[in-house]
Amino acid sequence: MNYLAGGSTVNPTEQGLNIPVDMAFAFHSDAGTTLNDSIIGTLGIYYTNVYNEEYANGASRYLAHDMTDLIQSNIVRDIRSLYEPDWTRRGMWNQSYYEARVPRVPTMLLELLSHQNFADMRYGLDPRFRFTVSRAIYK
């Protein structure tokens, strides 16, 4: 990621391919089960406490917080309105995961659902659900 953006306006301090990448996004499923097989839901992860809380272009790393909040809100709202009114928004973590810490552009890790939990996976295997989530991320 940093090599792609290196030399561009978003990462001017590193050498690279000079591609001004606006953001990095890691799409994951999480592990975990519940005793009653209820929805585990969606978690957003970002990280601010590195590089003096700034990206390479001087922008605040709190942009990742705002981006994570917007994307997670879109996803959960669309899932609740179209599929499951009780879909869980698990919160947002400001944690030092590699994928959130290293990129020099705003970054989000999305843990959409639990791949070990039937209540989550009955949606996760539905192509319409996948499209809805993808659209929610994009908009």
Q: What annotation goes with each model-predicted range?
A:
Residues 1-6, 29, 72-81, 138:
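Sec-exported extracytoplasmic/periplasmic mature domains
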Residues 1-40:
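Catalytic-core regions of hydrolytic enzymes
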Residues 29-53, 83-139:
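Active-site-adjacent mobile loop/cap segments within catalytic or ligand-binding domains
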Residues 56-57:
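Short histidine-centered catalytic/ligand-binding loop motif
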Residues 60-93:
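Active-site-adjacent substrate-binding region
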